[in-house]
UniProtKB/Swiss-Prot annotation:
This is STARD3 N-terminal-like protein. Tethering protein that creates contact site between the endoplasmic reticulum and late endosomes: localizes to late endosome membranes and contacts the endoplasmic reticulum via interaction with VAPA and VAPB. The lineage of its organism: Eukaryota, Metazoa, Chordata, Craniata, Vertebrata. Pfam families: MENTAL. Residues 75-97, 144-150 are extracellular. GO terms for cellular component: endoplasmic reticulum membrane; endoplasmic reticulum-endosome membrane contact site; late endosome membrane; organelle membrane contact site. It comes from Mus musculus.
Length: 235
């Protein structure tokens, strides 16, 4: 048997799914269409989708988690005050963890500004933060002396690297596709509602209803029948 090429099969599958979604939408009555439109408009009025809000919460968790680990590291290495002076005031690229904390602050500011305040629908902001984070951490791991300072020399760079890439995956595979799908659904529902408004309403059963004969008409027929039978009785 001849098999269709893969791209033709994908095209047929996509067209069938789109036709199925259109049939599903057109099969809904106008009241349900209006309810769906109002629900989508309500989501638009909220300003930010649920999945985007979850992404922003994860970005905040990234900053707080790295900050917590850095504070623990300051306590372990001789007290917060003394270690803070050593890592911030007398900053040394080869032995300080302060730059990893600043890297988390950089990710937080760029991502919250881009995807919560400006509500971007593009991946360039997350690509910037992930590229900067990956390049900086790789350079620091290769050039610095963090591994000689105990467990935190491994933990902080690895955690920062993993969190940055989880944010990238979540935005690219969850936030942007889901919001695009919801927008397409809204357009389909609005188009279906506009077409439904142009289609005349179907004929109801009441338009084909024939009322029963009235009692007045039946009484008149009975009187006429009696009058026609009277001459026959007289004979």
């Amino acid at each position: 048997m001849n098999h269709l090429p893969e791209h033709m099969e994908n095209t047929l599958t996509g067209s069938q799914s789109s036709h199925a979604s259109l049939r599903d939408i057109h099969s809904i009555n106008p009241a349900q269409l209006m309810a769906r439109i109002e629900s989508y408009e309500g989501r638009e009025k909220k300003g930010i989708s649920d999945v985007r809000r979850t992404f922003c919460l994860f970005v905040t968790f990234d900053l707080l988690f790295v900050t917590l680990l850095w504070i623990i590291e300051l306590n372990v290495n001789g007290g917060i005050e003394n270690t803070l002076k050593k890592e911030v005031i007398h900053y040394d690229y080869y032995s300080s963890y302060f730059d990893i904390f600043l890297l988390a602050v950089f990710r937080f500011k760029v991502l919250i500004l881009g995807y919560a305040v400006c509500r971007l629908r593009h991946w360039w902001a997350i690509a910037l933060t992930t590229a900067v984070t990956s390049a900086f951490l790789l350079a620091k791991v290769i050039l610095s002396k963090l591994f000689s300072q105990g467990a935190f020399g491994y933990v902080l760079p690895i955690i920062s690297f993993i969190l940055a890439w989880i944010e990238t995956w979540f935005l690219d595979f969850k936030v942007l596709p889901q919001e695009a799908e919801e927008e397409n659904r809204l357009l389909l529902v609005q188009d279906a509602s506009e077409r439904a408004a142009l289609i005349p309403a179907g004929l109801s059963d009441g338009q084909f209803y024939s009322p029963p004969e009235s009692e007045a008409g039946s009484e008149e027929e009975a009187e006429e029948k009696q009058e026609s039978e009277k001459p026959l009785l007289e004979l």
